[in-house]
Amino acid sequence: MNRQRTTGLLATIVLLASLGSACSKGDDKAVKGRNGPNGAAHDTVSDLSLNEDGLGQIQIGMNLDDAVNMGLLNENPTMNKQCDYVFPAVGAGIPEGVSAMVVRGKIVRIDVDTGTVTTEDGAKIGDTEDRIKSIYGNDVTIEPHTLIDGGHYMTVLGDSASAGKALVFETEGQHVARFRAGRLPEVKWVSGCS
């Protein structure tokens, strides 16, 4: 009887340990996966990429207060409520060179001015205009830059899931100097909130 009890207890311990291990593996995937409860689409900062809908957990259309409460963006106490920029919170894991345009409390655009952020298709600062054309093909429209002689705005409208949103690459004529993603019309505002 004592031996049966010991064997049963040992089997229960092994079963509980197996379940605990399986649950913790699933939790990692739930948090890191695109459909996870926190909406994280990337496992590391190195593969954080911009698309028409946002950058990681910072989503176009999101309330600024929500992004601040999640520790993604800093508050701006002197913010112009009509239109202003905010920057990533320290420790948020967002690379330098990223800012978010906020209009009436909503994130409407994310700008990348420097750094290592790429689009989900791999486009980045320093790419040639030809590379942008090769990535986006007929989806890219090219217009003359209003502030840089010889420069261009290369705009890629979002697909049906991202209707009303776009990516905009600014070039000095040959290379991407900066790019952004967001909703129309704000993503096409040439001078930001000015």
Task: Give residue ranges: language-model regions.
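Bacterial N-terminal signal peptides that target proteins for export
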Residues: 1-10
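A cross-family detector of function-defining hotspots
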Residues: 31, 63-103, 129-175, 181
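Glycine-centered tight-turn and secondary-structure capping sites
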Residues: 61, 120, 124-127
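C-terminal motif of bacterial Sec signal peptides marking the signal peptidase cleavage site
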Residues: 19-22
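Short, recurring structural edge motifs at helix starts
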Residues: 51-57, 116-121, 156
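Bacterial signal peptide processing site
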Residues: 24-26
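Short, low-complexity, Pro/Ser/Thr/Gly-rich segments in the mature regions of secreted, periplasmic
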Residues: 182-194
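N-terminal low-complexity, Pro/Thr/Ser-rich intrinsically disordered segments
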Residues: 31-62
